[in-house]
């Protein structure tokens, strides 16, 4: 009988294999970290930053937290039906208007098109409709389902969208499924509020509190500008000599344009650059009624009863008028004969 001898890797081979795997892991992590350091993530129209930093995107004051990073105010619009029936799919149309002829400052200081993003806070129980519930005619208007992301697993009624190319998604159609109080006891018929937050373009402040390169940069101290050093990547350093002789260096990233020159005297907080931001954030609130089908039927029956009553009254009035006219004719004939 022949036996096949199984060979096992030596200890040295095992260690070498482990080292190779470890090196691959370290190189991968290094690439990821360096990409974030060398090419920092832009303060774009990223609603998920609110998701990462706030349990609820709407503060007690009613303000949506996206406004903390997007400082300029811009309009936002939303259109929904006045009322919907339970377990039905309807459209929530969000419009994020902006001037398509302008370009924004990108993370590297170059100019590029604006992106858009939105957070739609639907009433409790309202969610994005599943693919199989969206009517065919509505599918032509609605984008891919992966565009719509829930704010959290337990907040399916709060929907995030973006960042998306503004040229294609200035108008976003949300397919919304209304709840059914017959199967969801936490929902009742009545009037509910809907809150929209929408932005176009990059933000001015990161969630960490640091400025992006899409913001105004100011003098950190009062004094005289002694030197301005511009780097090849578009960034600059502005040196300010204060009254006590101290030199302060303000660093300006690539993107904002300097509006000061050497020898100029500046006050503390004075703008050293222009405001490169062309985007902004808008908020809009509206209402929707979850209507009971029985109430609709009752209202229709009530209106039908009123209409029928009015018709009967008109017919009765005409009948009385005919009888009265006949009686008048008889009296007139009797008077003539007498």
From Swiss-Prot:
SUPFAM superfamilies: Cytochrome f subunit of the cytochrome b6f complex, transmembrane anchor (SSF103431), Cytochrome f, large domain (SSF49441), Rudiment single hybrid motif (SSF51246). The keyword rRNA-binding does not apply. One of its GO terms (biological process) is photosynthesis. Keywords: Electron transport, Heme, Iron, Membrane, Metal-binding, Photosynthesis, Signal, Thylakoid, Transmembrane, Transmembrane helix, Transport. Pfam families: Apocytochr_F_C (PF01333), Apocytochr_F_N (PF16639). InterPro entries: Cyt-f_TM, Cyt_f, Cyt_f_lg_dom, Cyt_f_lg_dom_sf, Rudment_hybrid_motif. One of its GO terms (molecular function) is heme binding. Component of the cytochrome b6-f complex, which mediates electron transfer between photosystem II (PSII) and photosystem I (PSI), cyclic electron flow around PSI, and state transitions. Belongs to the cytochrome f family. This is Cytochrome f. It comes from Leptolyngbya laminosa (Phormidium laminosum).
């Amino acid at each position: 009988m022949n036996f096949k001898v199984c060979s096992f890797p030596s200890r040295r081979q095992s260690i070498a294999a482990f080292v190779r795997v470890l090196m691959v892991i370290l190189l991968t992590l290094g690439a990821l970290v360096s990409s974030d350091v060398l090419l920092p993530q832009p303060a774009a129209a990223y609603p998920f930053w609110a998701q990462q930093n706030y349990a609820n995107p709407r503060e007690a004051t009613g303000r949506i937290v996206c406004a903390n990073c997007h400082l300029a105010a811009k309009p936002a619009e939303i259109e929904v039906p006045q009322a919907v029936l339970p377990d039905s799919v309807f459209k929530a149309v969000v419009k994020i208007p902006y001037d398509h002829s302008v370009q924004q400052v990108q993370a590297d200081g170059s100019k590029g098109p604006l992106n858009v993003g939105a957070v739609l806070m639907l009433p409790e129980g309202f969610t994005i409709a599943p693919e199989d519930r969206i009517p065919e005619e509505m599918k032509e208007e609605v984008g891919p389902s992966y565009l719509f992301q829930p704010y959290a697993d337990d907040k399916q009624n709060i929907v995030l969208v973006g960042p998306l190319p503004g040229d294609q998604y200035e108008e976003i159609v949300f397919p919304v499924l209304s709840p059914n109080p017959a199967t969801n006891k936490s929902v009742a018929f009545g009037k509910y509020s809907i809150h929209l937050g929408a932005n176009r373009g990059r933000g001015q402040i990161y969630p960490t509190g640091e400025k992006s390169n899409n913001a105004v940069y100011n003098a950190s101290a009062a004094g005289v500008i002694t030197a301005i050093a511009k780097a090849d990547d578009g960034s600059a350093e502005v040196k300010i000599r204060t009254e006590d002789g101290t030199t302060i260096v303000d660093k300006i990233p690539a993107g904002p344009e300097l509006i000061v020159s050497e020898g100029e005297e500046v006050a503390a907080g004075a703008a050293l650059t222009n405001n490169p931001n062309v985007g902004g954030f808008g908020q809009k609130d509206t209402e929707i009624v979850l209507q009971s089908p029985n109430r609709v039927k009752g209202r229709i029956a009530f209106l039908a009863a009123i209409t029928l009553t009015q018709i009967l009254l008109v017919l009765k009035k005409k009948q009385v008028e005919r009888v009265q006219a006949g009686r008048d004719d008889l009296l007139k004939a009797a008077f003539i004969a007498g």
